[in-house]
Amino acid sequence: MSMITEIYAREILDSRGNPTVEVEVYTEDGGFGRALVPSGASTGEHEAVELRDGDKSRYLGKGVLKAVDNVNEKLAPEIIGYDVFDQAGIDKKMIDLDGTKNKGNFGANAILGISMAAARAAADELGLPLYTYLGGFNAKTLPTPMMNIINGGSHADNNVDFQEFMIMPVGAPTFKEALRMGAEIFHALKSVLSGMGLNTAVGDEGGFAPNLKSNEEAITVILEAIEKAGYKAGEDVYLAMDVASSEFYDKAAGKYNLAGEGKVLSTEELVEFYAQLVDKYPIISIEDGCDENDWDGHKLLTDRIGHKVQLVGDDLFVTNTEKLAEGIEKGIANSILIKVNQIGTLTETFDAIEMAKKAGYTAVVSHRSGETEDSTIADIAVATNAGQIKTGSLSRTDRIAKYNQLLRIEDMLSDVAVYDGIKSFYNLKK
């Protein structure tokens, strides 16, 4: 046992220049942990609350001094004295103190900061890597990355409706080689886009954000880049998409407005559109294919293509075990996106991953569009043997920080390290 002796939070900036929370935890035996909390752009309406100040005279109302004060003045006095190794106890105490289902009292950004920093302090005190402390000595699977190389939707100022077009180097023998493949394709894509006279500026998550004629053109230019880099689509590399359809769903009309393509589709038409894309292109994963509240649409999509495509619930499940349990019961989707700040504690994050695996769902550990240099999610992916990670493109230090941490972990694990590649899609019949 080692008691927590000090907890301190401050306001810092994330990758979009918006304030976020940083927390430091100190223990009596010299343990130290620091955690930086991420934030999202497209957020599910059922996510845990990210507490912002709302004071328009500071950071356009996006300051987090209230959350910082909640750590320093309200949570710290209650958590100081806890055994730093009692992660579940620390997290439960903070949930109980908050007293709301969505952490709306203190803010998930306050609670998560302490949760992650405490884990880091515990690992530091034991002299263990974070992934080993969290996952034990069975933590050895490096995740197959989803690399976001074309940004659209709310992540970019262009006319592409779908939010993310990603590559997954499933044919690589190691994570190191997977990263190399991704980087080479990223640079090949820049060359392809430049040759077409298109913009090669990048979006929030480091992917390119060109104005393209359609969502389908985003797919075809990526396929061209894969070939240009010397790889084979559908063998070495598969495609993945985060549609983020809640962002273009017209609730009043019950229709999906693909403004970039000038199309308004019913749920049935949208599902058929996905089915046609999957038949035509090597797409292995689709995230949030329907609106977060269009559960009938998600069921239709799952029944239509769920046997051969990973269907990931992000806004649909918001890393929440209650939502996930409902989805499992109804046979909706076959995968969950795991975002630590959607739920607000490490304990609840691990519970969601465990529930998914027991039900035969895959789990994809994910970043947010507003990130920092914090690399905790890389350790979480390995600690839980999740098998997949989504942490942006092959540019911007806030994204590369996670990839570099995974390289270090693979190095530390040495011959014990496992990279599953295509095997990480264990529930598909593709």
Curated annotation (Swiss-Prot):
Record's subcellular location: Cytoplasm; Secreted; Cell surface
EC number from the UniProt entry: 4.2.1.11
A Pfam family hit: Enolase_N
Entry superkingdom: Bacteria
PROSITE patterns: ENOLASE (PS00164)
Main location per the UniProt record: cytoplasm
InterPro entries named among the record's database cross-references: Enolase, Enolase-like_C_sf, Enolase-like_N, Enolase_C, Enolase_CS, Enolase_N
Catalytically driven reaction(s): (2R)-2-phosphoglycerate = phosphoenolpyruvate + H2O
The protein, known as: Enolase
Species name: Exiguobacterium sibiricum (strain DSM 17290 / CCUG 55495 / CIP 109462 / JCM 13490 / 255-15)
Gene: eno
